[in-house]
């Protein structure tokens, strides 16, 4: 379990201020029953230190047995140092209300794991591969997976579609579509 301080901001005052802003914004979103979704939080990776990373999965309410839906997978921003999957809960709830499976990914960040963007990218690849291998469990179409993200998360989404494009790299993590919000690219 994480606290706001663990995942949002490196100092207590900043964490409390950011949490207040986010929770006030969430109140407006959650006021409508159409956008109220409780994600299923599923572990997709266990790290060497025993910590685990999770996918926050939002499923449409009107899914029928055996039906496959397209998915959109979000990666939060924060300079690979800070951030939380909560950043894209509003977007995930919106897409779930429109019939898509929406996922917000937890990945390693520098503040908690002393990691680099390279480890974050490995986590992003593992998240997509995990979703594809468990597609039937969540009724998602493994051939219709979009990725999205802002800033550092946009970098991860862009990298999933471009890095390792030669034939020696398995394409299980390659998205079918990328939606990039102000990505860090050169």
What do the predicted segments below correspond to?
Residues 67-78:
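Short beta-strand element of the alpha/beta-hydrolase
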Residues 126-186:
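Primarily recognizes the serine-hydrolase "nucleophile elbow" in alpha/beta-hydrolase
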């Amino acid at each position: 379990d994480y606290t706001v301080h663990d995942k949002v901001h490196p100092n207590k005052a900043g964490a409390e201020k950011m949490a207040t802003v986010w929770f006030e914004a969430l109140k407006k979103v959650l006021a409508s029953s159409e956008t109220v979704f409780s994600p299923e939080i599923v572990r997709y990776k266990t790290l060497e230190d025993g910590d685990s990373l999770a996918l926050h999965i939002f499923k449409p309410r009107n899914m029928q047995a055996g039906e496959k839906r397209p998915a959109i997978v979000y990666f939060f921003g924060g300079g690979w140092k800070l951030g939380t999957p909560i950043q894209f809960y509003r977007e995930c709830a919106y897409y779930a209300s429109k019939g898509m499976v929406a996922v917000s990914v937890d990945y390693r960040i520098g503040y908690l794991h002393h990691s680099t963007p390279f480890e974050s990218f490995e986590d992003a690849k593992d998240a997509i591969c995990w979703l594809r291998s468990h597609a039937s469990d969540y009724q998602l179409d493994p051939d219709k997976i979009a990725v999205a993200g802002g800033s550092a998360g946009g970098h991860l989404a862009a990298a999933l579609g471009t890095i390792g494009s030669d034939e020696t790299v398995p394409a299980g993590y390659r998205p079918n579509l990328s939606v990039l919000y102000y990505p860090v690219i050169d």
